[in-house]
From Swiss-Prot:
Binds 1 Mg(2+) ion per subunit. Gene3D superfamilies: Phosphatidylinositol (PI) phosphodiesterase (3.20.20.190). Keywords: Cytolysis, Dermonecrotic toxin, Disulfide bond, Glycoprotein, Hemolysis, Lipid degradation, Lipid metabolism, Lyase, Magnesium, Metal-binding, Secreted, Toxin. This is Dermonecrotic toxin LsaSicTox-alphaIB2ii. Its main location: secreted. Belongs to the arthropod phospholipase D family. Class II subfamily. Disulfide bonds join C45-C51, C47-C190. Dermonecrotic toxins cleave the phosphodiester linkage between the phosphate and headgroup of certain phospholipids (sphingolipid and lysolipid substrates), forming an alcohol (often choline) and a cyclic phosphate. This toxin acts on sphingomyelin (SM). It may also act on ceramide phosphoethanolamine (CPE), lysophosphatidylcholine (LPC) and lysophosphatidylethanolamine (LPE), but not on lysophosphatidylserine (LPS), and lysophosphatidylglycerol (LPG). It acts by transphosphatidylation, releasing exclusively cyclic phosphate products as second products. Mg(2+) binds at E25, D27, D85.
Amino acid sequence: WIMGHMVNAIYQIDEFVNLGANSIETDVSFDDSANPEYTYHGVPCDCRRWCKKWEYFNNFLKALRKATTPGDSKYHEKLVLVVFDLKTNSLYDHQAYDAGKKLAKNLLQHYWNNGNNGGRAYIVLSIPNLSHYKLITGFKETPKNEGHPELKEKVGFDFSGNDNIDQVAKAYKKAGVTGHVWQSDGITNCIASFIRGLDRAKEAVANRDSSNGFINKVYYWTVDKRATTREALDAEVDGIMTNDPDVIADVLNESAYKAKFRIATYDDNPWETFKK
């Protein structure tokens, strides 16, 4: 999965997919009542990027629905996965459940079209704080309560705080999650990737590939350089988040990687661990 980073303005959906992304990451900020409000990152953000692009969340969802609904004039067949980077650090821990519920209601109405030929992309909810695990509970209960239990098949989870992998496992246990797990690892592109290294990403990959691991997919962020792309591919991650999708696409075309990796399509289940 080539994951376009910080796609917060509607026009950027086309821009990133046209550069080679089959997945996008979108920031979601919340108001004081735990309602998702804007697709907005704010300052600071990655180097060489404008941090302040935004839309109202529901307007973005409607545009995203069009981009992922077959037959729509804005449809992109290859856009198959969307990561919502949930900026929940502005919320109190006790608001996490409500935030999940309200997020699900917004998606149900504006993205899934109340279960009537809505957008088809798989969704990853990326949560920065392990203590906000109840967001998952609130989110999962909502489609079920609204008569659309099938939509839970479209949703997976990620804790994005670079926490200890064992602690992440405990948070999922509390949330009752037993699958659909993506694990992110990384650092802003402003800091050279060699300073962080890939040790934790490799630890996540080892968990993914072990018989008793809880992780299904691993992605590394934010990668804009060819050398770092190669290192991440050598570590056998499933996804790379980038500001420059064309760079990742170029490296995937190199002879060393062409035979081993391919771009994921809608038929590739993002919740299944890839078996070599």
